[in-house]
Amino acid sequence: MIPQIQRNVIRQRVHTRIRERIQGTTERPRLNVYRSLNHIYAQIIDDTQGRTLVSASTIADKIKTGGNVAAAKEIGKLVAQRAVDKGIKKVVYDRGGYLYHGRIKALADAAREAGLEF
């Protein structure tokens, strides 16, 4: 079994490799996801200007439990609704070095259902 500290270092290395290839632009900003044990965070970032355009998390919103798949679906819908309201329809999905499974996949599927294309 890999200790949690080493697992996080491995994830950060994978995320660095992903970020070398993925770049958010003004036309297609980057949908970044961060997952902790108790919460999930999503933000849409324009890397050319270095600005966060839209964000949503289980801390800022009134979702009682933040560390489960249902909360990830809610955050996916919420960030997609906020993005569509600002005129953003196409994004690049940045899974943040996490496996595309569980909460990360649920957030992506909910964002797609709510109108984002990636």
Curated annotation (Swiss-Prot):
Keyword flag Ribonucleoprotein: yes
Q: Which GO terms describe its biological process?
A: translation
Q: Which GO terms describe its molecular function?
A: 5S rRNA binding; structural constituent of ribosome
Keywords, alphabetical: Ribonucleoprotein, Ribosomal protein, RNA-binding, rRNA-binding
**Gene Ontology, cellular component aspect:** cytosolic large ribosomal subunit
Kindly give the InterPro entries that the UniProt entry links to this protein.
Answer: Ribosomal_uL18_bac-type, Ribosomal_uL18_bac/euk
Q: Does the keyword Ribonucleoprotein apply?
A: yes
What's the superkingdom here? Bacteria
Q: Where exactly are the transmembrane stretches of this chain?
A: none
User: Which Pfam family is one of this chain's hits?
Assistant: Ribosomal_L18p
Q: List the disulfide bonds.
A: none
Per UniProt, subunit arrangement is: Part of the 50S ribosomal subunit; part of the 5S rRNA/L5/L18/L25 subcomplex. Contacts the 5S and 23S rRNAs.
| Family statement drawn from the similarity comment of this UniProt entry | Belongs to the universal ribosomal protein uL18 family.
What job does this protein perform?
A: This is one of the proteins that bind and probably mediate the attachment of the 5S RNA into the large ribosomal subunit, where it forms part of the central protuberance.
Q: What is this protein called?
A: Large ribosomal subunit protein uL18
Species annotation: Acidobacterium capsulatum (strain ATCC 51196 / DSM 11244 / BCRC 80197 / JCM 7670 / NBRC 15755 / NCIMB 13165 / 161)
Gene name for this UniProt entry: rplR
